[in-house]
């Protein structure tokens, strides 16, 4: 269908019409126990207000139907658009919204318009106001509510435009909204199926390597449709006032200044690109005042062509406001041309300039490596600057005192990004009274919440750190045998430890929220929710953390699941599920991730359901690829084979697995791993590969962590491409892929071509292409079918095998 035809269709049929019923005869159901668990309603999601006194409670169904997933979409400039809604295409909405007090004793159902569904909800930083969006026949509506009258939300607009951003954000005061109203679509001319001309691209000799993107613009009609759908009018709504228009443009999210009188605005401009997503299109960045008048044209950001892979644009980027200052703009600039391959003593600098932008900007600080953002103290005088060393995969965080520019910054964090054990935890932040993100502070103390990775699994913690001495005090740590993580700190009371919200779970108890008081006896625990186990019939499944070593001594780990009725001495068929990750050194590669004490949620297309069919499952088996970041993939195949062999040996040595009945599977890069293991080893009797990429010559400018191009590392690209070794895949391989996969690199064609290669070489394979599905699978019909196909495949080629 031509774009002109589609625009006519939008104008004539902009109602939310139901998608035509699809023939379901081809979709299958898995065993009843699996189907029942998939259909079990999930617990509601909880969003606490910033002061933690109240919460929004959102209810949804387990899975959407295929008709909802397959609603028509426009695939333009790297974004999928539900045109009648003037919003991003999504596969599931929510059905109920409630306001509850902290303890859940008082709950008020917030009314939704008849026939409409809840898209999302959020709190203002003042904790008194909340907003939510609904979708219906006329489009997307924005509503504003107050905690004192939750049953009487106010309709702000029934024509929200939420394509490039959420479509609304809070004013500095927190009691009003910035929002974007969809501009009327232009009148469509008569549909013309004859192209106006050829599609041309040209290059002029400059280096411009690009990752592979999907859903890009393809022609002038695409560009016109994208522009028409994204164009909107930006408004500011304050209490007691009429909405004030800031004009029509291709608006991004506005960023109001602390003074409430100025706002930073971003808009997309032409020329568009046919090779990059909209985030690389030219941008206009400007500051306007409370009367919508232009104060300063901050930047005209050019089309992002020629930006090196893993690099950044030259010129100003990452604009934002400095907290505790009325209207001081802060931004970053590259000093190395934005190229991570260029040698440089200093890569970035941060600058600031106050409205009305008189004089020259002030340089705040420089970073030796690529800047990763700023985290401010509440007074705006000290700032934590993050930076990242791409070559070493190393992260640092330095505390700068801007009142003492000559003082050396103090190091708060300095570690490999893969060093889970050395992670000091994330600095906890909150929104101040003007809506700016700042560190949570008690005098000189700031707070950190972390995962607490250890050899025994994760034990989350809460620390506080003195910014004067940099000493850290452990305030709380999760008890052994469970998993409890910090959600948020309550507003602090001077002279006492803070209370904090946590999310508690254990192998037998589903996640629930708690309030912990560190000043009270025995931790002062108060239960805030009481969500029940959605699948109690599966709770008998056994689960344990298993540690072992690769042949070269690298420590590895996995979580082993066994059926509830398993008896010691009984050997089961084994299913190994993994995802390779890259490491610079063995010490971090061997660190344990995750926790064996988390609640196991059986849902969706999860491979954990195989345990209900009599399988042992080794989940999240570590598959480290270790070496120099530039060359580690030269030994990718050897390393994953070694890790897989170690996992199988361990399960067999434990007496739970039968070496003659072992299968392997993975998703995305894990699917790539699966195909390689079948092509280059005889460890497995079958495999399941979902949504993978198998021919790396089709991702020639890098993939995953590979930094070299196909022409720089031809042998490696060929060596790790299972498509080019399809003649070696002599074990049965089930290939599953969403027909609408938009993940970079994993085009659906990748699975289609691998299937053809296996078939042509006399191998055994089955290709399942899922209509309407993207990189993950959402529709109930699709999920059920994937489970049925997977269970049957394993039983047919592995589970039913005779044991030698």
Residue ranges of predicted features:
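Bacterial N-terminal signal peptides
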Residues: 9-19
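Bacterial N-terminal signal peptides that target proteins for export
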Residues: 1-10
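Short, surface-exposed "cap/lid" segments of acyl-processing enzymes
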Residues: 566-570, 575-596
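Secondary-structure transition/capping motifs at alpha-helix termini
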Residues: 150, 288-293, 356-357, 389-392, ...
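N-terminal cap/lid segment of alpha/beta-hydrolase-fold proteins
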Residues: 527-570
């Amino acid at each position: 269908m031509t774009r002109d035809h589609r625009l006519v269709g939008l104008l004539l049929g902009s109602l939310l019409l139901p998608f035509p019923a699809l023939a379901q005869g081809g979709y299958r159901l898995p065993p009843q126990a699996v189907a029942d668990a998939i259909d079990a309603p999930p617990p509601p999601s909880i969003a606490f207000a910033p002061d933690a006194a109240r919460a929004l409670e959102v209810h949804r169904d387990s899975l959407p139907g295929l008709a909802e997933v397959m609603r028509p979409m426009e695939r333009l400039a790297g974004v999928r658009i539900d045109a009648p809604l003037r919003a991003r295409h999504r596969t599931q909405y929510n059905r109920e919204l409630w306001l509850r007090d902290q303890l859940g004793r008082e709950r008020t159902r917030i009314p939704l318009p008849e026939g409409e569904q809840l898209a999302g909800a959020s709190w203002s930083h003042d904790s008194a106001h909340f907003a939510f969006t609904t979708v219906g026949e006329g489009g997307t509506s924005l509503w504003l509510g107050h905690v004192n009258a939750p049953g009487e939300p106010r309709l702000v607009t029934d024509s929200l435009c939420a394509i490039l951003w959420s479509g609304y954000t809070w004013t500095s005061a927190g009691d009003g909204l910035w929002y974007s109203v969809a501009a009327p679509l232009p009148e469509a001319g008569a549909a013309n199926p004859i192209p106006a001309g050829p599609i041309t691209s040209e290059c002029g000799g400059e280096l411009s390597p690009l990752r592979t993107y999907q859903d890009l613009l393809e022609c002038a009609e695409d560009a016109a449709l994208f522009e028409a759908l994204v164009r909107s009018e930006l408004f500011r709504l304050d209490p007691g006032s009429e909405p004030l228009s800031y004009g029509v443009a291709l608006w991004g999210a506005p960023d109001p200044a602390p003074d409430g009188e100025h706002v930073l605005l971003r808009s997309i401009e032409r020329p568009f690109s046919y090779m990059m997503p909209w985030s690389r299109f030219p941008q206009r960045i400007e500051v306007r005042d409370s009367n919508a008048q232009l104060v300063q044209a901050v930047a005209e950001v050019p089309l992002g062509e020629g930006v090196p892979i893993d690099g950044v644009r030259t010129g100003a980027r990452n604009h934002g406001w400095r907290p505790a200052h009325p209207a001081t703009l802060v931004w970053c600039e590259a000093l190395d041309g934005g190229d991570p391959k260029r040698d440089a003593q200093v890569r970035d600098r941060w600058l600031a300039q106050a409205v009305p932008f008189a004089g020259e900007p002030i340089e705040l600080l420089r970073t030796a490596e690529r800047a990763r953002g700023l985290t401010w103290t509440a007074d705006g005088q000290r700032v934590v600057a993050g930076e990242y060393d791409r070559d070493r995969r190393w992260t640092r965080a330095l505390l700068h005192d801007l009142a003492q520019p000559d003082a050396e910054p103090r190091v708060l964090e300095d570690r490999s990004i893969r060093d889970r054990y050395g992670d000091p935890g994330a600095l906890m932040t909150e929104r101040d009274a003007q809506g700016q993100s700042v560190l949570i502070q008690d005098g000189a103390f700031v707070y950190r919440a972390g995962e607490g990775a250890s050899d025994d699994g994760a034990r989350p913690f809460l620390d506080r750190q003195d910014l004067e001495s940099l000493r850290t005090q452990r305030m709380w740590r999760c008890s052994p045998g469970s998993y409890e993580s910090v959600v948020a700190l309550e507003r602090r009371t001077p002279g006492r430890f803070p209370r904090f919200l946590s999310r508690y779970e254990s192998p037998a108890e589903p996640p629930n929220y708690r309030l912990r008081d560190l000043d009270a006896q025995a931790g002062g625990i108060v239960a805030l929710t009481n969500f029940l186990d959605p699948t109690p019939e599966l709770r008998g499944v056994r689960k344990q953390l298993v540690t072992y070593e690769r042949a070269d001594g690298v420590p590895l780990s996995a979580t082993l699941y066994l059926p509830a009725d398993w008896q010691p001495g009984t050997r089961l068929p084994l299913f190994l599920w993994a995802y390779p990750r890259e490491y610079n050194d063995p010490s971090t590669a061997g660190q344990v991730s995750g926790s064996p004490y988390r609640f196991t949620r059986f849902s969706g297309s999860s491979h954990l359901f195989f345990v209900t069919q009599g399988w042992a499952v080794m989940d999240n088996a570590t598959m480290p690829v270790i070496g120099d970041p530039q060359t580690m993939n030269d030994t990718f195949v050897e390393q994953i084979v070694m890790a897989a062999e170690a996992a199988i040996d361990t399960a067999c040595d434990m007496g739970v697995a039968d070496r003659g009945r072992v299968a392997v599977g993975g998703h995305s890069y894990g699917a790539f791993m699966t195909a390689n293991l079948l092509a280059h080893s005889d460890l497995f009797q079958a495999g399941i590969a979902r949504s993978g990429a198998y021919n790396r010559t089709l991702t020639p400018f890098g993939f995953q962590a590979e930094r070299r191009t196909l022409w720089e590392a031809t042998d490696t690209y060929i060596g790790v491409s299972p498509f080019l070794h399809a003649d070696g895949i002599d074990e049965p391989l089930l290939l599953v892929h969403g027909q609408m996969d938009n993940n970079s690199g994993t085009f659906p064609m990748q699975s289609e071509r691998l299937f053809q290669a296996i078939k042509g070489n006399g191998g055994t394979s089955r290709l399942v292409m899922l209509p309407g599905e993207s990189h993950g699978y959402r529709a109930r019909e699709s999920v059920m079918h994937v489970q049925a196909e997977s269970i049957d495949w394993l039983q047919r080629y592995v589970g039913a095998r005779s044991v030698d």
